[in-house]
């Protein structure tokens, strides 16, 4: 609960520094999971609701099934993805350790060239590299980050990414389902689509505070995508329901 609250504060609180990458390994699957849960489940529910003969119980069962299946699928996918990235990082760290042990001067020259290519004077780049090479572990981390673009700080943990994406997806998928658990008919339909679009709009605004995009444009984009998906599946459900009968 504390971790979830901290994440919400980071999203809807003051804008983060443009160079602050803390938590970015968890942010991506969390935001993607919530958005995917909202859009996929409202699309599923609207598609079934579009069939004129759809039993309200069928809508609820489909919504619950979509929530559970999507949540576990997101968790499995994120775990495998981040775990694979971690294994690649571990391999590159060990490879770099061997290279620093056997060809330190060559590695030193490579790092000097990297910093020089970024605009640093060569003399200054050599001084920086000299300080970095004095600490073997710092040197390994620097080489992996600068040469390959991998960093443990921005990658996150496989378990954290899996749990975050599953919870976010489930929470998002629950929004369009909730009205059908409490109500039925046109009112449940209206509240389901309205609640989903509102949640997508707020999610877009929250993400814009981290990406430094225009909040209104980001919110409307998220809500617009959800509306199009729901409208298409509702139309398909209506056509199929009419064709069957």
Language model features: what each stretch is:
Residues 1-26, 82-165:
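Cytosol/matrix-facing amphipathic helices and coiled-coil assembly/linker segments
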Residues 186-198:
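Structural signature of hydrophobic alpha-helical transmembrane segments
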Residues 235-245:
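Juxtamembrane boundary at the C-terminal end of a transmembrane helix
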Residues 202-229:
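Interfacial loop-to-transmembrane junctions
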Residues 26-42, 152-178:
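Transmembrane alpha-helical segments and their cytosolic interface motifs
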Residues 22-33, 56-64, 124, 156-163, ...:
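The feature identifies polytopic integral membrane transport proteins across all domains of life
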Residues 2-81:
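Internal alpha-helical transmembrane segments
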């Amino acid at each position: 609960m504390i971790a979830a609250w901290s994440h919400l504060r980071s999203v809807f609180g003051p804008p983060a520094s443009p160079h602050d990458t803390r938590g970015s390994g968890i942010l991506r699957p969390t935001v993607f999971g919530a958005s995917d849960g909202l859009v996929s489940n409202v699309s599923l529910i609207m598609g079934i609701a579009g069939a004129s003969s759809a039993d309200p119980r069928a809508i609820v069962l489909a919504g619950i099934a979509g929530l559970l299946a999507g949540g576990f699928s997101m968790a499995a996918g994120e775990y495998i993805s981040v775990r694979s990235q971690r294994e690649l990082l571990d391999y590159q760290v060990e490879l770099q350790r061997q290279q620093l042990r056997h060809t330190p001067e060559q590695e030193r020259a490579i790092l000097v060239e990297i910093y020089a290519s970024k605009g640093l004077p060569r003399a200054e780049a050599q001084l920086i590299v000299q300080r970095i090479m004095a600490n073997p572990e710092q040197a390994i981390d620097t080489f992996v980050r600068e040469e390959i673009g991998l960093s443990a700080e921005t990658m996150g943990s496989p378990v954290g990414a899996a749990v975050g994406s599953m919870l976010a997806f489930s929470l998002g998928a629950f929004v369009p389902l909730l009205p059908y658990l409490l109500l039925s008919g046109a009112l449940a339909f209206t509240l389901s689509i309205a609640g989903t679009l509102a949640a997508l709009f707020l999610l877009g605004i929250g993400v814009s505070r981290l990406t430094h995009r225009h909040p209104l444009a980001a919110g409307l984009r998220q809500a617009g995508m959800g509306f199009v998906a729901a409208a298409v599946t509702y139309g398909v459900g209506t056509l199929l329901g009419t064709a069957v009968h």
